[in-house]
From Swiss-Prot:
Encoding gene, per UniProt annotation: KAR2
Species per Swiss-Prot/TrEMBL record: Yarrowia lipolytica (strain CLIB 122 / E 150)
UniProt keyword annotations, A-Z: ATP-binding, Chaperone, Endoplasmic reticulum, Glycoprotein, Hydrolase, Nucleotide-binding, Signal, Stress response
Segments of this protein annotated with the region Substrate-binding (SBD): 407-507
Biased segments, Acidic residues type: 647-663
Catalytic activity: ATP + H2O = ADP + phosphate + H(+)
Residues annotated to bind ATP: 45-48, 104, 234-236, 300-307, 371-374
Annotated glycan sites: 464
Entry protein name: Endoplasmic reticulum chaperone BiP
Amino acid sequence: MKFSMPSWGVVFYALLVCLLPFLSKAGVQADDVDSYGTVIGIDLGTTYSCVGVMKGGRVEILANDQGSRITPSYVAFTEDERLVGDAAKNQAANNPFNTIFDIKRLIGLKYKDESVQRDIKHFPYKVKNKDGKPVVVVETKGEKKTYTPEEISAMILTKMKDIAQDYLGKKVTHAVVTVPAYFNDAQRQATKDAGIIAGLNVLRIVNEPTAAAIAYGLDHTDDEKQIVVYDLGGGTFDVSLLSIESGVFEVLATAGDTHLGGEDFDYRVIKHFVKQYNKKHDVDITKNAKTIGKLKREVEKAKRTLSSQMSTRIEIESFFDGEDFSETLTRAKFEELNIDLFKRTLKPVEQVLKDSGVKKEDVHDIVLVGGSTRIPKVQELLEKFFDGKKASKGINPDEAVAYGAAVQAGVLSGEDGVEDIVLLDVNPLTLGIETTGGVMTKLINRNTNIPTKKSQIFSTAVDNQSTVLIQVFEGERTMSKDNNLLGKFELKGIPPAPRGVPQIEVTFELDANGILRVTAHDKGTGKSETITITNDKGRLSKDEIERMVEEAERFAEEDALIRETIEAKNSLENYAHSLRNQVADKSGLGGKISADDKEALNDAVTETLEWLEANSVSATKEDFEEKKEALSAIAYPITSKIYEGGEGGDESNDGGFYADDDEAPFHDEL
């Protein structure tokens, strides 16, 4: 499929103009700002959450009722009450089946997703399938209840809202919430739904590394800088490469693994000690949720200690069957158990550099975000990758994301001091539709700044086609069948016309939250249909996103050949149809050639189309090109006679016939 993309400079300028009304103080309507009140910024994390607010040009990260500025993303149900945060986590070991954590690993996903199935094996609480989606089952007040991941997340968001309301002394109704950069549309939609359940209007979903870059960039806005944000949290990992200059934050590329973080490191240690304990005592503690819960709590503490010490002792009284647990964990052993996971974090770093075309020596700063970046080995590997360049430690890795979210919240609510900030985020996967031959025609490329809008004209594939099917895909492969179907709809009522004549304008609108709206508009009749891709349309899981990018690289040569073959086929088919139509045009070419020449051309076109029908699947790119040359060899001498025969010597191809090197323009067919 041939289509042109605007230069990045034009895209950047257009997006800057597009974004300013949303992000500058002047662009927010006064009435809207008044109705917003104070907008808060929330980092809804896998293991911990954090909330901030901007007042008077300064960001405050708010402490909870325990005096801590980070709150565990835990929800627990007892016989009498529901607990959220520290209170829930503190009783987890004694109430493992009714204490919910890591809910971010389930939100927006399907029950049958591989990652969900892998995770629920390790959760002490029960997860069951309800209408294809995972729900948690708890027992409270003498009865069993089920909750969706959105509901559990809403309980955590409500806790963060309450912290802000206690600080502000007034009601809070609007928020900016962060998500991992590689969260897909379903996960983003589910996060917004959680906000609604919590009584919050989520004005903007912001990618976590982008939010962290805002926190970093406020003090570094003079000269242009390329920075890598390395965000390794409790359950997810993101890397983004950004350009910051004069308050403009442009995301150049993003990559990551939404299933890699501190909890995975903990699990390796837990697995090691469980195996050791079972062998030593000839028991099996794997099925005892309370025992594993106690070990999980202490292993997390030990991991934190090892960031500043070379070894630590783990002591647990009445660990199992009255026996105590006492083992030493060294930093060296912790690193040995997790070294492959640590090294795995470097692959997305390589990916963003490759995608953006930036060399690692041109990176000005590396910003560390997330508690897991405190692990010395992680810092060492990253420093080695960047040839000795040390990471910036000017911001608190636990609070940076909430800080950036609070700044963005301040922008949206018209706070002083943030008028000049412009945020240019990107979409993680290419978006397009299926066209003739099963090819995915791209409309919005991967790593395009959002919000963005892209339109392209398509046409019908057969004569008198009254309906076109618009199938929307995301992914990096040439053929749509190898990508992920997001949704489909039909545009009906197209008036009868030869193939290629109707003009169907397809428009993709991707908003600042990464949510997609697709419209098909028949320019002839004015009819249009629209679909918004929401969380029930089956967006991708994180593993599928990584697989698509890897497969796209692995099969790049194969994909290129397939695309070239289909283009050659389409070129031949359109050339033949264009020739037939113009021979039939009595006011044009058809009225200027002899009956014998007309018959010769029609016979050649008919033979070509019959050959196409018989060989379209098996023929190679070269076959299609040779067939087109053969048809052109018959057509060219006939059309040349027009100009040699006294038609005024006009070389403007009067009559509308297009020679081989001046092919009739045509739109991709639906």
